């Protein structure tokens, strides 16, 4: 079976999910959106749940590659943090919080994929970043990196909780940015603050 066609179905499903949430989108909707028969759709995915799991896995693999690229190309831990912020802006600005809610409530297997990724990749990567920052003198040495790494990842989930931050009142990206900036400045030493300000000012002047 064609990998290109499978990827096209995943991309088409993601497009509709981001617009309307997962629960309200049917396999009929996806087939119609892609201009293909539902029979063709079911050649690749037995049901919507399987499609959602495939979509989550694809995006998590992409996120892991981006994280590794940022680590490899950044000169120090503060530059990593700034580049992570820019990467996060791209991701969070297109995420519909309803999608997060639907995955948690209706697709537990897909949500488990994310939880495993968080435990195996994200928390470990953040712990290593914090340790490296302490060695470089930019992150406060009094921090417990395990606690801070877990706290940060749960902050992200909280930011997408629509019962706390209703989408009618809050921009998901602005919420995530505020939480991330609060975290970054909270963990930095004075020299870390200075470098963080330098990078932020440079990014702001480029964007203007």
Regions found by a protein language model. Name each.
Residues 128-132, 136, 169-208:
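C-terminal peripheral helix-coil segments that are non-catalytic and often amphipathic
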Residues 93-127, 134-138, 146-147:
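Short secondary-structure transition hinges
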Residues 79, 117, 135-151, 169-178:
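All-alpha amphipathic helical-bundle segments outside canonical DNA-binding/catalytic cores
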Residues 54, 58, 65-98, 149-152, ...:
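Hydrophobic alpha-helical connector segments
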Residues 1-20, 24-36, 50-53:
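Basic, helix-initiating cap at the start of DNA-binding domains
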């Amino acid at each position: 079976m064609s990998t290109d066609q499978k990827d096209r179905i995943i991309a088409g499903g993601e497009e509709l999910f981001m617009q309307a949430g997962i629960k309200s989108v049917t396999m009929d909707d996806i087939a119609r959106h892609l201009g293909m028969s539902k029979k063709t759709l079911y050649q690749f995915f037995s049901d919507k749940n399987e499609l959602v799991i495939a979509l989550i896995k694809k995006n998590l693999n992409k996120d892991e590659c981006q994280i590794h690229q940022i680590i490899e190309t950044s000169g120090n831990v503060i530059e990593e943090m700034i580049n992570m912020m820019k990467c996060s802006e791209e991701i969070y600005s297109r995420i519909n919080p309803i999608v997060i809610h639907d995955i948690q409530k209706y697709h537990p297997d897909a949500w488990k994929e994310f939880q495993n990724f968080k435990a195996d990749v994200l928390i470990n990567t953040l712990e290593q970043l914090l340790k490296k920052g302490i060695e470089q003198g930019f992150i406060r040495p009094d921090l417990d990196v395990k606690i801070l790494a877990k706290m940060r990842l749960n902050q992200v989930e909280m930011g997408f909780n629509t019962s706390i931050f209703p989408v009618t009142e809050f921009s998901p990206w602005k919420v995530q940015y505020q939480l991330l900036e609060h975290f970054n400045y909270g963990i930095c030493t004075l020299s870390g603050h200075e470098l963080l300000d330098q990078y932020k000012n440079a990014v702001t002047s480029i964007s203007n």
